[in-house]
């Protein structure tokens, strides 16, 4: 699905494990069930958020500048995106994509997974969402595929997407369009510097 970069900050796709195509991602040493590195969020604050339902057969897009929500918690900076996904359909695969916009900025996502009781069950830091080069139908983006096995009896999971002050101090090196074109047509790769995208709170 092609989406306009100026309108999309985050795209979340939920589906059954077998239905999601493989994506090459850099190896990241992490244990998703270890939530100790995630910000501590009071239950009352989580309950005040509006959780957008995600249909596993569709892509859910959120423009953080206009559709993000505020969560005033230490360790979280800027607007957040909050989704709910069905947990009673077996093993889940969530693909989160954050596209680089025309101003060469990008939202570096962190993802906290909560069970139906709003208890943290998995955490994916921003380092998990790696840079993916543009393709025919895709833009420069940060992307990560999260595979989850909900506990028996769970009806839904909650997915909280946010960025941090530490992430805002970092950048992502992109592939220069001329290099991407040369690579695509089989020409020699020009020796030119790659653009650098700064990290922002809203991806716009």
Region annotations inferred by a language model:
Residues 27-62:
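Predominantly extracellular/luminal regions of secreted and cell-surface proteins
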Residues 81-84, 122, 136-149:
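Exposed aromatic-hydrophobic patches
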Residues 90-94, 147-173:
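Noncatalytic modules at the cell exterior or secretory-pathway interfaces
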Residues 64-88, 143:
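Non-catalytic, beta-strand-enriched accessory regions in extracellular/secretory proteins
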């Amino acid at each position: 699905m092609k989406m306009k970069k100026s309108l999309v900050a985050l795209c979340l796709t939920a589906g059954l494990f077998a239905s999601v195509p493989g994506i090459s991602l850099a190896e990241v040493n992490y244990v998703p069930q270890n939530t100790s590195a995630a910000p501590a969020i009071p239950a009352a604050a989580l309950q005040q958020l509006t959780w957008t339902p995600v249909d596993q057969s569709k892509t859910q897009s959120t423009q953080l500048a206009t559709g993000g929500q505020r969560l005033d918690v230490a360790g979280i900076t800027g607007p957040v995106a909050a989704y709910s996904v069905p947990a009673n359909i077996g093993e889940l695969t969530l693909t989160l994509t954050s596209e680089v916009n025309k101003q060469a900025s990008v939202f570096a996502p962190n993802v906290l997974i909560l069970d139906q009781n709003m208890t943290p069950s998995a955490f994916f830091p921003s380092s998990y969402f790696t840079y993916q080069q543009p393709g025919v139908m895709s833009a420069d983006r940060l992307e990560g595929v999260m595979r989850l096995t909900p506990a028996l009896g769970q009806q839904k999971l909650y997915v909280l997407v946010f960025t941090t002050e530490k992430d805002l101090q970092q950048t992502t090196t992109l592939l220069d369009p001329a290099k991407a074109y040369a690579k695509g047509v089989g020409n020699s790769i020009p020796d030119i510097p790659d653009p650098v995208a700064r990290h922002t709170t809203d991806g716009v």
